[in-house]
């Protein structure tokens, strides 16, 4: 990778294409997932920070993209990755359909959606338990939306459906720690981990039993492996709702971890209406294969958008990365 490609994505020699893919259900307030694809000697990388992320935070996403395109990933320790199906804030009938179509033995259920009544969360989790059966595993994800008292009340309410763990019930480390001390269900930290030093803070605060790691926000597979080692807690690898190009990086991380005690949140292609590859990374019998993916020209053309705005974001992220180096 040349310095020009790292510092000025608009002038590098690598192929760069932007995409916009619709979501089947609203997620984080959006209905379309956009990003930039970069092709290098090692394959394709994805740069897809959410719209609210500025250059400094996006710089880690750019580093992950460059790692995938120019450096490649560590050798895998396993050939397939167990994954969970993700159930968004939908009604019980749709939740049942999603679980049935996923083929997974673990389900992550979104709860605490803004504007929704808490009883809808109960009905959704109840439907998922009925659909996945008594041997299936259920985890719920509040995305930090509950205050401590609400989190404690809701976790106790939902645990009658036998929760595996609750992901990011509250926003701050202090709140996570208090929730963890007051409930019997394990707590996982997700949004609390976005920088290399965050896992150490989580561990020091005794705020979580599990950490959720995502490749792009942490700066790449190797950076995420260092984070996992420093943290010393069980790891769940999750996606940022990327195309199969971005998902492949998450699969590479999960494949390289010394231990993988939980199903990973990487079966998210079902949340998108299209993909940029001919053979999307979708689960078979609850597992994803460990493999690189190749962008399919026809598939990409169907979702391609003007790359200029994304090249500008990448350039700003690259400049922020250089400033922090």
Model-found features: residue ranges?
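N-terminal capping/lid subdomain adjacent to the active-site entrance of alpha/beta enzymes
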Residues: 1-160, 277-325
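Catalytic beta/alpha-barrel core
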Residues: 106-117, 137-144, 161-173, 185-195, ...
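Shared catalytic-loop signature of beta/alpha-barrel
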Residues: 64-65, 197-298
